[in-house]
Design a protein with these regions (language model features):
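Pyridoxal 5′-phosphate
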Residues: 1-120
């Protein structure tokens, strides 16, 4: 099969699948808990964040503006919601205008509609 729609879904590398399966089999602890499985899960998540930050910003994992946080989301819609609602609320004192177009992804448009109902 030849799959050409990598905008929506991209097949991951086999090594990524193997690592994920290992984590699901052995790293299922709640990372917010204090028992050993939870502590191990927290350590795994911190290591993953560090690897992603280093891939994005180099060996220090820091950008030009200093340290960065990395938030894992369940997917694009959740990430869009977090970014758009967060930016709108953070910057609302500078103005409540949001510019978008009808060709945006539905997740973006729904955020903008919700913000419009809140006076943006």
């Amino acid at each position: 099969m030849i799959y050409l729609d990598n905008s929506a879904t991209t097949k991951q590398y086999d090594e990524v699948t193997e690592i994920m399966v290992e984590a699901m089999k052995n790293g299922f602890g709640n990372p917010s808990s204090l028992y050993q499985l939870g502590l191990d899960a927290e350590k795994t998540i911190k290591a993953a964040r560090s690897r992603v930050l280093k891939a994005a910003f180099g060996e220090t994992g820091k950008g030009g503006a200093g340290d960065y946080d990395l938030v894992f989301t369940s997917g694009g819609t959740e990430a869009d919601n977090m970014a758009i609602f967060g930016a709108a609320k953070l910057l609302q004192r500078q103005g409540r205008q949001i510019v978008t177009t009808a060709v945006e992804h539905p997740a973006v448009l729904e955020c903008c509609r919700a913000l419009e109902e809140q006076g943006f």
